[in-house]
UniProtKB/Swiss-Prot annotation:
Belongs to the class-II aminoacyl-tRNA synthetase family. It comes from Streptococcus mutans serotype c (strain ATCC 700610 / UA159). One of its GO terms (cellular component) is cytosol. This is Glycine--tRNA ligase beta subunit. Pfam families: DALR_1, tRNA_synt_2f.
Length: 679
């Protein structure tokens, strides 16, 4: 027989961002618990609101499956003494399994007999096992915790109710002094405490108390209500996925409504309006059918339509205060001078161990100038980079960015344009923040891209220099994201700037404000971010071989990894890698970069390999380059089959090593082939 199990944890309001990962974690840990305890089930359904986390296990077995496992013990010669009695080793082994020596039998394994015991355990009724659910609830982890009353135990929020039902039977458990039962809570304002009749009636019982327990159902309700508003008013609403996810985890009974604001505020930059509505008030933005912003918004109430007009007015009033602030800052900021704001950056701390924002900006300016040379930009682009790098942080001291920090860079572009800066400079001021997430949008302009890379490089090197290096998952200064941005931008624009040489050259810069330190750590950190750029399907040994190549150019490393992974299933791959590995291993014994003397070749195979190496030239197509290299495999094999490299004649040996080194150096621009496994 099977039954349905319901577990609901009733809490005080959780932050919206915690709800979804927490219910997923509960489902996963519940599944592990049931599997570990040999309780089969069909599926686990999830329910969540800001005030509850619940799962329903469908068709849970009413009894554990029986358990039987064989255990191998010591060899027979160790298990028995000279008189044939069981030794302490044998007795200790069976005692550790909860058995006696009566359970011992001997089995032959590879010609020798060993002690074996079989442990059988009859399955227990599910009700006896489910007391362990408390351990599951206690094991949940959260990004923030609190403790309350006399409890030393911390949890995301205080727990008020615990429902545990096996079909319609309430189980007696205790969690943080809360006894389980069938009492749950309805909507905070519209509902009341209610009894859950059975696991199967959970959603229905809560719906009667104005709680929609299924997050997907709440999401569908919100979307349907917004679409209905669109039809009624002939408008278009942007349903942002992140905002929708947040809103549905702020409410238990959603009711969408439309509010409005004075049209005069449409004169503000659109980003100010959208940020005020979406980010600060969690409103959905409303546009007309052409995409033009309208003086309206859609919000979602946690409740029904009763007194909805009062809710609309309240939301309009709150938004009005935001828009009035935005209007004030927009007007006042335009009176400021960029030069004055830049000067004031000298008084703004970038980090207490690193210095001011102005000093950071000046270091970035030098790095940007160097990068512009390496990227072969035009004189005009270099001039634009110099200007942008001289001012690009100025908007941090504007009132608008002080109030709406999400608009940093965005407002900088607008204020720079109003101040008469060129479009390229203004755009770079905005784009230098990109990407704002590990896979976010990248700069589109070369000037913005160079400034973004320079800014992130100084940030990375500065924090590493003062010992603020990420460890484990701890990365408070988002240095992984910044470094990922560096390699992604270099890859996008195809700038063939070797990262090892780039970093080495930056460490030669002479700044008054800071001396870069910990170069090896920086290079290792960047290497890790480049590896993230390589497709996850590429085998680890190929990734490592490419990263250990001599190129250190992001685009080429990514393309080389893809090309080698593509070839890995081809018939000639193994032979080609083995040939090149032999070349690499012997080339390590050479003095490197020395000339090859063809006059002392002793056989035709040396000459054939030399000619092939001299004719080996790579193109922009990495797959083609790998093919050009692999086609040399028969020539390499013929050389090794007919030529002893490590001969007694020192000149001949050195010459042959130099020949192999010449090939290895060319091949190493693709990968360190002796690191690729062929078994």
């Amino acid at each position: 027989m099977t039954k349905n199990l319901l577990v609901e944890l009733g809490l005080e309001e959780m932050p919206a961002y915690v709800v979804k990962p927490s219910i997923k974690q509960l489902r996963q840990k519940m599944g592990q618990f049931l599997e570990t305890n040999r309780l089969s089930f069909e599926k686990i359904e999830m329910f969540s609101t800001p005030r509850r986390l619940a799962i329903r296990v469908v068709h849970l077995a009413d009894q554990q499956s029986d358990y039987s496992e064989d255990f191998k013990g010591p060899a027979k010669k160790i298990a028995l003494d000279a008189d044939g009695h069981f030794t302490k080793a044998a007795q200790g082994f069976v005692r550790g399994k909860g058995l006696t020596t009566d359970a011992i039998e001997f089995r032959e394994v590879k010609g020798e007999e060993y002690v074996y015991v079989t442990k059988n355990e009859a399955g227990k009724p599910a009700k006896e096992v489910l007391g362990g659910l408390i351990d599951v609830l206690q094991s949940l982890t959260f990004p923030v915790n609190m403790h309350w009353a006399n409890h030393t135990f911390e949890y995301i929020r205080p727990v008020h109710t615990l429902v545990v039902l096996l079909d319609d039977e309430a189980l007696d458990l205790n969690f943080l002094d809360i006894k389980s039962g069938r009492i749950s809570r309805g909507h905070r304002f519209l509902g009341q405490e209610t009894q859950i009749a059975s696991a199967a009636s959970y959603e229905t019982d809560l719906r009667a108390e104005f709680v929609i327990a299924d997050a997907k159902e709440r999401e569908d309700m919100i979307i349907e209500q917004i679409r209905e508003i669109e039809k009624t008013y002939n408008v278009s609403v942007e349903i942002d996925e992140a905002l929708l996810s947040e809103v549905l985890n702020l409410v238990e009974y959603p009711t969408a409504f439309m509010g409005s604001f004075d049209e005069k505020y449409l004169e503000l930059p659109e980003e100010v309006l959208v940020t005020s509505m979406k980010t600060h008030q969690r409103y959905f933005v409303v546009r007309d059918q052409t995409g033009k912003l309208l003086p309206n918004f859609i919000s979602v109430r946690n409740g029904n339509e009763q007194f909805i007009e009062n809710v609309v007015k309240g939301n309009e009033k709150v938004l009005l205060a935001r828009l009035e602030d935005g209007e004030f800052f927009w007007r006042e900021d335009q009176r400021l001078q960029i030069a004055d704001l830049v000067e004031k950056l000298k008084l703004v701390t970038f980090h207490e161990k690193i210095g001011s924002l102005y000093e950071h900006m000046m270091r970035t300016k030098q790095i940007a100038a160097y990068l512009a040379e390496q990227a072969d930009l035009t004189d005009q682009e270099k001039a634009e980079i110099e200007r942008a790098a001289s001012i690009y942080k100025f908007d941090l001291l504007t009132g608008m960015v002080g109030e709406f920090d999400e608009l940093q860079g965005i407002m900088g572009e607008k204020y720079a344009t109003l101040a008469g800066e060129s479009q390229a400079v203004a755009t770079a001021v905005r784009e230098h923040y990109l990407p704002i997430s590990s896979d976010g949008q990248l700069p589109d302009s070369k000037v913005g891209a160079i400034l973004a890379v320079a800014d992130k490089l100084d940030t990375l090197l500065s924090f590493f220099s003062v010992g603020l290096i990420p460890s484990g998952s701890n990365d408070p200064y988002a240095l992984r994201r910044a470094t990922q941005g560096i390699v992604r931008i270099l890859d996008k624009f195809g700038w063939e700037i070797p990262l090892d040489r780039l970093v080495a050259n930056l460490y030669q810069f002479d700044f008054d404000s800071l001396t870069y330190q910990n170069q090896a750590d920086v290079l290792a950190f960047i290497r890790g971010r480049v590896e993230k750029m390589i497709d996850k399907s590429v085998p680890k040994d190929i990734r490592e071989a490419v990263l250990d190549s001599s190129t250190h150019i992001v685009r080429l490393e990514v393309e080389a990894a893809a090309a080698l992974a593509e070839k890995a299933d081809e018939d000639h791959f193994k032979a080609s890698i083995e040939s090149l590995s032999r070349v690499f291993n012997l080339a390590e014994k050479s003095n490197h970069n020395e000339m090859v003397d063809t006059s002392i070749f002793e056989n035709e195979y040396e000459q054939e390999l030399f000619d092939a190496v001299e004719e080996l030239h790579f193109t922009e197509d990495m797959t083609d380059n790998v093919d050009r290299l692999f086609v040399l495999s028969p020539i390499i094999d013929a050389f090794f089959d007919n030529t002893m490299v490590m001969v007694d004649d020192e000149a001949v040996k050195k010459n042959r090593l130099n020949l192999l080194d010449r090939l290895a150096q060319k091949a190493n621009t693709i990968a360190a082939f002796n690191e690729i496994r062929t078994k």
